[in-house]
């Protein structure tokens, strides 16, 4: 069955396969399996699938990379990844307030509860601006931050907010 699945997946459009990988990465984040998410990220990079994503999903993928490394407590690497993410955003147009806020957090020195509360507050304020509201629909970032503040499982918080 597994070999038949590989054949079927290999026959799909590479951009669709990349999208599927991003969806599975999100579910790995959601269910607290960051090691598996990192394996998928590395596989996507090795196969060049990250280059098959459109601009929007590439931004989402890059944000997931930051989130996974935060979950794994790879803080030194996180700073470099945040710098690379900001350069990518600047090359591809003007970064939104949402993107700048998250990149600034991941580039930061402190990831304690106060820094998370500050990030949550800033993003909550940004969420009320109509031009950036759509960014919160793709990534449940506020729930993810709440998960890190409270220590509750991410999936539990999503259920509490009746998301996914």
Which residue ranges define each predicted feature?
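Composition- and surface-driven signal marking solvent-exposed, interaction-prone regions
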Residues: 39-40, 56-58, 78-83
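Alpha-helical protein-protein interaction scaffolds
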Residues: 1-3, 10-17, 21-24, 28, ...
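Alpha-solenoid helical repeat architecture
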Residues: 8-21, 49-61, 92-101, 131-139
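"A position-specific structural signal for the A-helix of alpha-solenoid helical repeats
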Residues: 16-30, 57-71, 104-105
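Amphipathic alpha-helical segments of tetratricopeptide repeats
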Residues: 1-10, 39-50, 83-94, 124-128
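C-terminal non-catalytic interaction modules
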Residues: 76-164
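Short coil/turn linking the two alpha-helices of tandem helical-hairpin repeats
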Residues: 51-52, 71-73
